[in-house]
Amino acid sequence: MTEAKEIIKFAGLEVHFNLFNTDTHDQVCLFKVVVHPGARMGVPHYHEHFDETIYGLKGNTTYTVDGKTIELAAGDPLFIRRSTPHGFANVGAEISEFLCVITPAVFGPEYFREIAPVLNQPGPPDVPKLKEILLKYGLVPVMA
């Protein structure tokens, strides 16, 4: 795989961008996610305007999609249709990695650049700020 154009790190996750939305006239965005042991998606959510296709590269990532648990291993594909609540975690002791393809790419690195500082702050995250950022980019939080 070619070297990432940008890497954004936050809360035990690394997002390695290989193809920006701006590279494809907002048709496709491609990035690799590295999930360190114990890390999880910051806020479970669903997307209003785009679908997400995942492909496992390394280790195991536990996804929850529409209330169902799915174990994603290397070589496993997963399609998450827009409006489907989902989240993920690495509950194992080893790093997991997966590719993520966003279509159409109405969502790109801007979201991660904005949310990373909020999730990297010491102490509990600012939930109203997280919600504001998610909604700005068409992600609807599913919080308890």
Q: PLM features: what roles do these ranges have?
A:
Residues 24-26, 82-109:
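Ligand-binding loop in jelly-roll beta-barrel domains
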Residues 17, 100, 141-143:
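Structural signal for conserved beta-strand scaffold positions within catalytic alpha/beta enzyme cores
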Residues 113-144:
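Acidic/histidine-enriched, glycine/proline-rich intrinsically disordered or flexible terminal extensions
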Residues 8-44, 50-51:
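A short glycine-rich, His/Asp/Glu-containing loop-to-beta-strand
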Residues 14, 60-62, 69, 85, ...:
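Structural motif
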Residues 32-36, 46-64, 101-102:
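Short, conserved beta-strand element in jelly-roll/cupin
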Residues 42-44, 65-70:
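Short beta-strand segments
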Residues 8, 67-85:
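Short acidic-glycine-tyrosine-enriched beta hairpin
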